[in-house]
Amino acid sequence: MPNCFKFHTVIERHWQKPYPVLSFLLKPLSGLFAKIAAKRRTDFLSGKRQSEKLPVPVVVVGNIHAGGTGKTPIVAALVSGLQEKGVKVGIISRGYGRKSKAVHVLNAESRAEDAGDEPLLLFRKTGAPTAVGSSRAEAGRALLAAHPDIGLIVADDGLQHYALRRDVEIAVFPAADTGRTDLDLLPNGSLREPLSRLDSVDTVVVSGGKADALFRPSENMFHSRIEVGRIYRLNNPSEILDTGRLKNQTVVAVAGIAKPARFFDSLRNMGITVKRTVALPDHADISAADLPDADAVIITEKDAVKFSDGICTDNVWVLPVCAIIEPDLAAFVLERLEDVPKAV
């Protein structure tokens, strides 16, 4: 795991600031990847490969990057917005990081190893019926069988999962990449599909800041920003942390997410002095035994769902976040669904 993690870290740094030697080696592979990805999508669009239409509208929230775009909080915000408008929403996802490959409809007893950390977090934050499966269509069928009153399904990720037809496509794109001219497809870059793919989605949500003035891939553009909530105790969420009392304490921050630096910066921006940071691979397993010794250990919500109730973690605290999307993305989705659905 350490060697794999180190190699992945090198590649991610290359994606952010390309190394000429690596680009020379990886560029041909990116060209091959582009041809394979384009053919796969064309096969689904032409009907050469079969795709399935669920009996309710499907809204896909995904990205053309290989993770780290801030998509999960945006999915939670969209689902909550639709719920506020009286829509019975369900969520489907692949469930990255879980140990089982079987379709699983989440319930109060579901654990991260059953569902994956992100779907479990979405389920707990929104209360929306949720199912996971490597086949999004199969997960959708299972979800509708368990909750037949669902009127709309939001697919967390899956923009490239063309085996499931969708009625609305939402692409999340990081603001930091909107002005870049050196983006490339995997493995030389972090893109799963070319930038031109953004021309065919219903809307683009720019996450984490303002977009470059020249970035306008869609006539329908939304922007999201992250707001942090009050830090709470892991084993007693009603107890809020008084950050003022941390001044003379040892504080360690731990994150198993795609862009851990964002989490660490958020804590520092709150005036918290973090003595040590621990960055784990995205979706990494984590338990109380893995946490460093400190007066206070602060973790992400995504990591918090991996801990079982009743474990002695009195010194572990959780920083909640939420996405603020402007303008109203939920209203846009409902307006879009009044039009003729787009079969993909």
Curated annotation (Swiss-Prot):
Keywords assigned by UniProt, alphabetized:
ATP-binding, Kinase, Lipid A biosynthesis, Lipid biosynthesis, Lipid metabolism, Nucleotide-binding, Transferase
The residues forming a coiled coil are none
Give residues annotated as binding ATP: 65-72
Enumerate the InterPro entries for this protein.
LpxK, P-loop_NTPase
Q: Which GO terms describe its cellular component?
A: plasma membrane
Gene Ontology biological process: lipid A biosynthetic process; lipopolysaccharide core region biosynthetic process
Chain segments annotated as transmembrane: none
Broad enzyme group: transferase
Pathway listed for it? Glycolipid biosynthesis; lipid IV(A) biosynthesis; lipid IV(A) from (3R)-3-hydroxytetradecanoyl-[acyl-carrier-protein] and UDP-N-acetyl-alpha-D-glucosamine: step 6/6
Gene Ontology MF term list: ATP binding; tetraacyldisaccharide 4'-kinase activity
Answer yes or no on keyword Plastid. no
Which pairs are disulfide-linked?
Answer: none
- The EC number(s) attached to this protein equal 2.7.1.130
Q: Which reaction does it catalyse?
A: a lipid A disaccharide + ATP = a lipid IVA + ADP + H(+)
What is the recorded function of this protein according to its Swiss-Prot or TrEMBL entry? Transfers the gamma-phosphate of ATP to the 4'-position of a tetraacyldisaccharide 1-phosphate intermediate (termed DS-1-P) to form tetraacyldisaccharide 1,4'-bis-phosphate (lipid IVA).
Q: Which family does it belong to?
A: Belongs to the LpxK family.
- What is the name of the protein in this document? Tetraacyldisaccharide 4'-kinase
Identify the gene encoding this protein.
lpxK
